[in-house]
Design a protein with these regions (language model features):
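Acidic/histidine-rich helix-loop elements
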Residues: 75-99, 179-180, 217
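Eukaryotic short linear interaction motifs
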Residues: 78-81, 126-127, 149-150, 198-199, ...
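Structured beta-strand-rich core segments of catalytic domains in phosphoester-bond hydrolases
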Residues: 38-67, 107, 116-215, 219, ...
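Short coil/turn segments at secondary-structure boundaries
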Residues: 83-87, 131, 145, 168-171, ...
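Short, acidic/polar
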Residues: 97-110, 365
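Active-site beta-strand/loop signature of hydrolases that rely on acidic residues for catalysis
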Residues: 69-75, 104-129, 157, 190, ...
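Active-site beta-loop-alpha substructure in enzyme catalytic cores
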Residues: 215-217, 221-236
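Metal-dependent phosphoester-hydrolase catalytic domains
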Residues: 2-57, 228, 235-248, 253-417
Length: 417
């Protein structure tokens, strides 16, 4: 007799039911659902073009032979994340976990298809960044900070199909018996050569520099000394090569756009007579008005309006007490590098045109990261914009599950003149 499957009334086959889960498996499933975050999506950041050599909004469009993409990114050192997070709710722990963050940091770097990358706060160079970047076609150099209790540093990577590192030059800001240069901050400089130079008999060379200056907002005289040391080194390096090499300088400068130190970088001159160390970096400015404006107006076009004053207008930073003055109160500082800031747009008598934020956490919501370039020898074609301030204020702070650093990356396209 032929076996037939009995079909219940209605003509539909009944589905077998799973046995009821016991209490322990139910708890495990609930815990798994709580601990598994939704798949993060990258936050949209549009390009702003300064010149029309290519369609920057479409990263698949190939760059011209003489054009390259530069990225600077403070990746938030793992050991700094761990410190001070013990009392936070458990639901926040995963976004600080290195295995979780490391994957998303690499996605952020490779997302923009850069050719040269400067990273700050790198404390997993040999076991993570170097092998991962090598796999992506990069070669790099690294300099760790000099302190016994500091485990991070600066790294420079270049796409080896386009560039080679001719030489690298670490700079230590700690100088024995110096009255001010007594901190463990560092810089790293590399002379880079383009492999396929166009328009010249010899390969084009330029200088790439990465730095992370002191954070302390009250010790501006230390930052001024560090900055002065770095700029003198760059000037000397250019002379050693018997050429006016183009310079790209980026990093976490821990100074605001309205500050005397920003004025020094952008104009090449600073009269430090009587300036207060408390105000040199501009980090102590009350940003309440900026925060309020950011909440009210989320228009992308206002991203670069609201930070800073016009160049030179920092009279409020004059010292009121002798103990706040810089260690060389009558010194006029200068450099001849003729820097322009890649992100400064439409500066006027009220603002420098820098973004409102490049860092966003509970301790600081400000612009402290920059890409500087020698305007006579490099041309900036455009930049990737910051996340709108109104959107950032919807988060308590960075990092989030979508963005794994408390800094935003800076990305710009350049060509040699």
């Amino acid at each position: 007799m032929e076996n037939k499957t009995e079909v219940p009334r209605g003509g539909r086959r009944q589905r077998s039911r799973r046995p009821a889960a016991d209490a322990s498996s139910s708890k495990t499933e609930d815990k798994r659902q709580r601990m598994t975050p939704r798949k993060p999506r990258p936050i949209h950041r549009p390009w702003t073009l300064y010149a029309p050599p290519r369609i920057a909004e479409d990263p698949s469009v190939p760059l011209a032979a003489s054009t390259f993409r530069f990225m600077s990114f403070n990746v938030l050192a793992d050991y700094l994340v761990i410190n001070g997070r013990e009392n936070e709710p458990a639901k926040h722990h995963q976004k600080y976990d290195w295995e979780y963050r490391s994957v998303r940091l690499m996605k952020e770097i490779l997302r923009w298809s850069p050719h040269i990358v400067n990273l700050q706060e790198v404390d997993h160079f040999e076991d993570f960044f170097e092998p991962r970047m090598k796999k992506a076609g990069f070669v790099g150099v690294y300099k760790r900070r000099t302190g016994e209790n500091t485990h991070d540093g600066c790294a420079i990577f270049v796409k080896k199909s386009m560039f080679r590192i001719v030489s690298s030059h670490p700079i230590e800001y700690h100088v024995l018996d110096h009255p001010v240069l007594d901190r463990d901050n560092i810089a790293l400089t590399a002379v880079v050569e383009a492999k396929n130079s166009v328009g010249g008999p010899s390969p084009a060379r330029f200088v790439v520099t990465n730095t992370h200056l002191l954070f302390n907002p009250n010790r501006g005289e230390i930052k001024l000394a560090q900055l002065d040391m770095l700029l003198k080194h760059l000037t000397s390096l250019r002379k050693e090569h018997n050429a006016i090499l183009p310079v790209l300088l980026s990093g976490d400068f821990n100074l605001a756009p309205h500050s005397p130190l920003y004025h020094f970088l952008s104009t090449g001159k600073l009269d430090a007579s009587g300036l207060s160390r408390y105000g040199l970096s501009g980090q102590n400015l009350d940003t309440y008005a900026l925060k309020k404006a950011a909440r009210v107006n989320e228009n992308d076009r206002t991203r670069h309006h609201g930070n800073g004053t016009a160049f030179g207008k920092f009279d409020s930073y004059r010292a009121q007490r002798d103990d706040f003055r810089v260690y060389k109160p009558n010194t006029v500082y200068s450099h001849e590098l003729d820097f322009a800031s890649a992100y400064a747009q439409l500066p006027d008598d009220k603002c420098t045109g820098e973004p409102k934020f490049t860092i966003f956490h509970s301790g600081s919501k400000a612009t402290v990261d920059y890409i500087w370039y020698t305007r006579s020898s490099l041309h900036c074609h455009g930049v990737v914009e910051m996340i709108p301030a109104g959107l950032l204020f919807k988060h308590d702070e960075l990092p989030t599950t979508e963005h794994s650093s408390d800094h935003l990356s800076l990305v710009a396209d350049f060509s040699l003149r």
